Curated annotation (Swiss-Prot):
Reaction(s) catalysed (UniProt annotation): sulfate + ATP + H(+) = adenosine 5'-phosphosulfate + diphosphate
Name by which UniProt lists this protein: Sulfate adenylyltransferase
EC number: 2.7.7.4
Pathway: Sulfur metabolism; hydrogen sulfide biosynthesis; sulfite from sulfate: step 1/3
Keywords for the protein's UniProt record, in alphabetical order: ATP-binding, Nucleotide-binding, Nucleotidyltransferase, Transferase
Single GO biological process annotation from the record: hydrogen sulfide biosynthetic process
Similarity comment: family membership: Belongs to the sulfate adenylyltransferase family.
InterPro entries: ATP-Sase_PUA-like_dom (IPR025980), PUA-like_sf (IPR015947), Rossmann-like_a/b/a_fold (IPR014729), SO4_adenylyltransferase_pro (IPR020792), Sulfurylase_cat_dom (IPR024951), Sulphate_adenylyltransferase (IPR002650)
Species of provenance: Synechococcus sp. (strain JA-3-3Ab)
HAMAP family xrefs: Sulf_adenylyltr
Any GO MF annotation of the entry: ATP binding
Presence of the UniProt keyword Nucleotide-binding in the record: yes
Length: 393
């Protein structure tokens, strides 16, 4: 589905919808009673959801071997369409042995609640070390993405999926805006250019600065924080969402910002994930995407601007969405403003660099981040959350 009047078509031209109608859902529930059941972990559940709502268009299910190999080797699907990360369903060899290609498999959560169905078209083994090297550029088990990969099952199941019903998000139902809805909102507001911003951290002054720089040249900002699985030391989603609400209320032009949750899981795949994040935002209807310093990175596995350079490996028309590449922003003590090296006359020692890590360290010590780091309302919320949890963020 693509609607005329949309600012940009979905990736591949059609917005995928794999959510069953109420009538279909009833039939599928009956069918599922006679199917083998597979219990999905948090990442697989969020992947199922993202496929079903069209966030991963053109994917209609979990990848087969041909697409998987092609994505690993070329960052394109087998049909030539740009795609940078494998979206796969791993299971143990024991579970896979009991499943036959051509079967329908019931997909359930850890508690056994039926979520959807998979039409199993293929099952295949894969090389974990090779996938780690290709996707994450490292085989180090300390890398959170590699760690997940090494711990998961050794067989991938492939095939189209159907989600039985779209449930409201348990924590943020008001911010659950799926691609068809975000596109509708952009049309209603008359936005022709929309910039997407991906985050898994509270928004500090550096993020605010680059978002507002982007807002100077586009019609609207789609603030799209990730609320799927993240590292255990990332700040909890409910705290982050409260920070975003306060910021938009006090410091942004509200009519030019839409806040929505992104239910995807974080891979920490750095450059490849930056492309992936851009394509997902294209499906939500964004024409532009902010790529900052060390986008989707972790530790020191990637260079600070590797996630920007990777966009140069694709022709602009292959991606369709325009990356807005920003340098690391800081508070310039010479001009008394936020800036980057492109706009500041300061020397390195006259710059206050901001990072989520620094803020977490300050909070751990019981300190309130200064206004050069964070807006006071955000700093207060983070400090309160730290006290309530009584443990490091």
């Amino acid at each position: 589905m693509t609607v005329s009047g949309d600012a940009i078509p979905p990736h591949g031209g059609t917005l995928v919808n794999r959510i069953a109608s109420p009538e279909q859902a009833q039939e599928l529930r009956s069918k599922a009673e006679h199917c083998p059941i597979l219990h999905l972990d948090e990442r697989a559940q969020s992947d199922l959801e993202m496929i079903a709502i069209g966030g991963f268009s053109p994917l209609t299910g979990f990848m087969g071997r041909e697409d998987y190999q092609s994505v690993l080797e070329t960052m394109h699907l087998a049909n030539g369409l740009a795609w940078s990360l494998p979206v796969t369903l791993p299971v143990s060899a024991e579970i896979a042995a009991d499943l036959k290609e051509g079967q329908t498999i019931a997909l359930a959560n850890a508690e056994g609640r039926l979520l959807g169905l998979l039409e199993l078209t293929e099952k295949f083994t894969y090389d974990k070390t090779r996938e780690a090297q290709q996707v994450y550029r490292t085989t180090d088990e300390q890398h959170p993405g590699v760690k997940v990969l090494y711990q998961q099952g050794s067989v991938y199941l492939a095939g189209p999926v159907t989600l039985l019903q779209r449930d409201p998000h348990p924590l943020f139902p008001a911010y659950q805006i799926d691609p068809a809805q975000s596109r509708q909102l952009f049309r209603e507001r008359g936005w022709k250019t929309i910039v997407g911003f991906q985050t898994r951290n509270p928004i500090h002054r550096a993020h605010e600065y680059i978002q507002k720089c982007a807002l100077e040249i586009v019609d609207g900002l789609f603030l799209h924080p990730l609320v799927g699985a993240t590292k255990s030391d990332d700040i909890p989603a409910e705290v982050r969402m409260r920070c975003y609400e306060v910021l938009i209320e006090k410091y942004y032009p509200k009519e030019r910002v839409i806040l929505a949750i992104n239910p995807a899981a974080m891979r920490y795949a750095g450059p490849r994930e930056a492309i992936f994040h851009a394509l997902v935002r294209k499906n939500y209807g964004c024409t532009h995407f902010i790529v900052g310093r060390d986008h989707a990175g972790v530790g020191n596995y990637y260079g600070p601007y590797d996630a920007q350079h990777i966009f140069d490996e694709f022709r602009p028309e292959e991606l369709g969405i325009i990356p807005l590449k920003f340098e690391h922003a800081f508070y310039c003590t010479v001009t008394g403003t936020m800036a980057t090296a492109k706009t500041s006359p300061s020397q390195p020692h006259q710059r206050i660099h901001l990072s989520g890590t620094k803020v977490r360290e300050m909070l751990r010590r019981g300190e309130i981040p200064p206004p050069e780091f964070s807006r006071p309302e955000v700093a207060q919320l983070l400090a309160e959350a730290m006290r309530e949890r009584g443990q490091p963020e």
